[in-house]
């Protein structure tokens, strides 16, 4: 059994981790930390886990995290990098759901997250946690910085158009002019109290935010450049807040080059993802819905070419708390410990 600890178990990604790991046949939950809720039974805070998780929240000092095989950080940015060095020294693997180990450039990290990175040597060895792209590296990793929710949808939506193994080295699209129009449910903002996510503010409302620049932008650009194998990437990324709890819907717009105008893109996507257990390339003309993946680790993609013109539209949906966060973390953990990738992640989406 894999002994698992969770640092920061009181937020939405934390409880989602608990839900998934409590059902995982190869996991023993050994510690869940919270400084503010230490001593409280987990099931008291989250009644949905009653009878499934018997642990109490503990302080990080009492949790004996060094005795775990792997520790998940479902914490604000900056926490994982402060504790990773000691855990790694004790042979504990680290999976961070925040951004501490995503951006490889420490200056970019400081610019977008407002803090200096205090362990660049660990950042250098960290693997970006997007299994469909970095599977082999994740298998050998000690530290994984999980891909963000928006970045997961955008990168998986565009990978078949950029990856040389799919394109044969041809530039099928103008990579310098990509548009991502992305929408998220309110759980993406976390569990903290904020005016913008209060029911009276978010319900019956729809708005864009961070149009000037969202902190996921450099992460997406970094990932797309790595997938393409070149730096000729330009992205306009505009996120929106929608009046729903879970879900991300990204509508991606790309312009085809002359080399890309005679390609069967439905077939291209189907071939690229044919062996991926969590990626569903839907039939031509489909319109995926966020509720079709709610509570599951699946991601659904549909390809459109309006009027047969030179614009390709890719629709992508995922559950931001599962494939966009905790489920992807479990998927990476499975790879790191040599388990089948789908172990503990076969939940069917909840509908309605």
Swiss-Prot record:
It comes from the Bacteria. One of its GO terms (molecular function) is N-acetyl-gamma-glutamyl-phosphate reductase activity. Transmembrane segments: none annotated. One of its GO terms (biological process) is L-arginine biosynthetic process. Keywords: Amino-acid biosynthesis, Arginine biosynthesis, Cytoplasm, NADP, Oxidoreductase. Its main location: cytoplasm. Its EC number is 1.2.1.38. This is N-acetyl-gamma-glutamyl-phosphate reductase. PANTHER family: N-ACETYL-GAMMA-GLUTAMYL-PHOSPHATE REDUCTASE, CHLOROPLASTIC-RELATED (PTHR32338:SF10), N-ACETYL-GAMMA-GLUTAMYL-PHOSPHATE REDUCTASE, CHLOROPLASTIC-RELATED-RELATED (PTHR32338). SMART domains: Semialdhyde_dh. Pfam families: Semialdhyde_dh (PF01118), Semialdhyde_dhC_1 (PF22698). Pathway: Amino-acid biosynthesis; L-arginine biosynthesis; N(2)-acetyl-L-ornithine from L-glutamate: step 3/4. Catalyzes the NADPH-dependent reduction of N-acetyl-5-glutamyl phosphate to yield N-acetyl-L-glutamate 5-semialdehyde. InterPro entries: AGPR_AS, AGPR_type-1, NAD(P)-bd_dom_sf, NAGSA_dehydrogenase, Semialdehyde_DH_NAD-bd. It is an enzyme of class 1 (oxidoreductase). It is found in: Cytoplasm. It comes from Polynucleobacter asymbioticus (strain DSM 18221 / CIP 109841 / QLW-P1DMWA-1). Belongs to the NAGSA dehydrogenase family. Type 1 subfamily. It catalyses: N-acetyl-L-glutamate 5-semialdehyde + phosphate + NADP(+) = N-acetyl-L-glutamyl 5-phosphate + NADPH + H(+). The active site is at residue 149.
